[in-house]
């Protein structure tokens, strides 16, 4: 046996040991490795015992998929595997200590972080992006959200679970740089409650937070943020917030998801489900409430890179927004339990009947099945959420406590710190057409988020 073959087997053996604690998964669509993932995860080779040929075959097939689907290099695949090994080790250690009190990192609303907490988090995000190692770790993670993911992780039941796993990887990457940082969530219902005329004046689009809201981002911690070549019409991160296209997360939708006793199964709030509750806007237009639909509206509202599938994660806002979507889902899961429903088994299977099937391998994370994203493991072992309170919002310089004990965003009033960056030449004016819920295509990547509403 030559040295390279031996080293390759050692690496794969280490990988198999590292994921030995992983949730079982079986790929029913690939006959040549059917059942292999589950068998490999159940077994843990001892000492110098070689990994079985079937296990080697299964994981080499995964590596081939990642290369063909995402065009990842060997270094990028190894990087993602290393994040998974760390995550599974964390889960395993927490399970071993389940009878003891275990501290879990707390995800809070971004504006309720202390000044130091927020600066540390934003600096760590910037450090992940600006790292010059090969591969660039931020770009590798962002590329997991490229076009091949669209039919697997959007427009159906797997949207929630896939993005939950995706956030976990991203947070693990941040904590490698600084171990005490935790993701925060951007609750855009605080913007919604300002009223439509004031949405764009929210203080988060300032140098203290996310930077300017239009044009190339030239202020704040994410200024002069390079984009991979050819991804958009711009070489740098840009936004294009425009009134009448998209909107913040509707607080009426959030209230229904949190409290309506008639929406207690996932089919009532997932894309292509039967949708129980509706919202009627000021023009008399009615839409069903789904978490994914409300999520799409925020992408369209921020615009720019956020308005299209491929470049969306290049804007750090993406992860703060999706952290809120995950928070909303967790609040819904808590409501399900109050009504004696089990969120871990209530997988509706809406969307593409094959790719969103409960037992289909989760694209990009093939050691999970889609239904594994609905597990309680994440909020029991990796993180938990803290809901905003009016008392906390009262003491924050970026929020106020409004009527009905609702937290509302503070504003940068017109004429105060509303800097805009250079406009993107030939950049898309609108990501999507609202009429008919159809997509307008970007000149560079052709994929966006379907809008569900364009006004209050």
UniProtKB/Swiss-Prot annotation:
Secretion signal, residue range per the UniProt entry: 1-22
GO function term, MF aspect, one: metal ion binding
Gene3D superfamilies: Di-copper center containing domain from catechol oxidase
Free-text cofactor note: Binds 2 copper ions per subunit.
Superkingdom of this protein's organism: Eukaryota
Keyword set, alphabetical order: Copper, Metal-binding, Secreted, Signal
Cofactors that this protein relies on: Cu(2+)
Entry's transmembrane regions: none
InterPro entries documented for this protein: Di-copper_centre_dom_sf, Tyrosinase/Hemocyanin, Tyrosinase_Cu-bd
Tissue specificity of this protein: Prismatic layer of shell (at protein level).
Coiled-coil ranges (or none): none
GO CC terms, sorted: extracellular region
Protein's UniProt name: Tyrosinase-like protein
Biological classification of the source: Eukaryota, Metazoa, Spiralia, Lophotrochozoa, Mollusca
């Amino acid at each position: 046996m030559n040295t390279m073959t031996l080293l390759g087997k050692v690496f794969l053996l280490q990988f198999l040991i590292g994921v030995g604690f992983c949730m079982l998964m079986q790929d029913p669509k690939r006959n040549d490795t059917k059942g292999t993932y589950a068998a490999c995860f159940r077994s843990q080779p001892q000492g110098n015992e070689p990994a079985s040929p079937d296990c080697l075959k299964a994981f080499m097939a995964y590596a081939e998929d990642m290369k063909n689907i995402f065009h990842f290099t060997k270094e990028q695949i190894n990087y993602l595997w290393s994040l998974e090994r760390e995550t599974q080790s964390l889960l395993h250690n927490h399970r071993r200590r389940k009878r003891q009190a275990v501290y879990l990192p707390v995800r809070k609303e971004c504006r309720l972080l202390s000044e130091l907490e927020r600066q540390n988090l934003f600096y760590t995000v910037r450090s992940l992006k600006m790292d010059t190692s090969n591969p660039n770790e931020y770009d590798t993670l962002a590329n997991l959200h490229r076009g091949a993911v669209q039919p697997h992780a959007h427009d159906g039941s797997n949207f929630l679970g896939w993005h939950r796993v995706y956030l976990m990887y991203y947070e693990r990457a941040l904590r490698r740089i600084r171990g005490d940082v935790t993701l925060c969530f951007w609750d855009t219902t605080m913007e919604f409650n300002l009223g439509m005329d004031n949405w764009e004046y929210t203080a988060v689009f300032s140098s203290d937070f996310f930077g300017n809201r239009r044009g190339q981002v030239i202020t704040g911690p994410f200024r002069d943020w390079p984009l991979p070549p050819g991804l958009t019409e711009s070489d740098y991160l840009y936004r294009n917030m425009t009134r009448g296209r998209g909107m913040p997360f509707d607080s009426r939708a959030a209230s229904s998801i949190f409290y309506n006793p008639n929406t207690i199964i996932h089919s009532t709030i997932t894309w292509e489900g039967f949708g129980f509750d509706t919202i009627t806007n000021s023009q008399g237009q009615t839409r069903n409430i789904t978490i994914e639909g409300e999520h799409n509206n925020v992408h369209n509202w921020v615009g720019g890179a956020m308005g299209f599938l491929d470049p969306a994660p290049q804007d750090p806002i993406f992860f703060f927004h999706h952290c809120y979507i995950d928070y909303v889902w967790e609040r819904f899961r808590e409501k399900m339990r109050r009504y004696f429903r089990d969120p871990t088994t209530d997988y509706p299977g809406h969307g593409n009947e094959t790719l969103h099937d409960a037992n289909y391998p989760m694209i990009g994370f093939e050691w999970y099945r889609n239904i594994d994203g609905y597990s309680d493991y994440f909020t029991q072992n990796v993180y938990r959420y803290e809901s905003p309170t009016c008392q906390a919002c009262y003491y924050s310089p970026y929020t106020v406590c409004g009527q009905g004990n609702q937290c509302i965003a503070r504003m940068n009033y017109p004429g105060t710190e509303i800097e805009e960056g250079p406009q993107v030449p030939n950049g898309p004016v609108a990501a999507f057409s609202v009429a008919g819920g159809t997509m307008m295509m970007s000149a560079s990547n052709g994929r966006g988020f379907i809008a569900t509403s364009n006004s209050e």
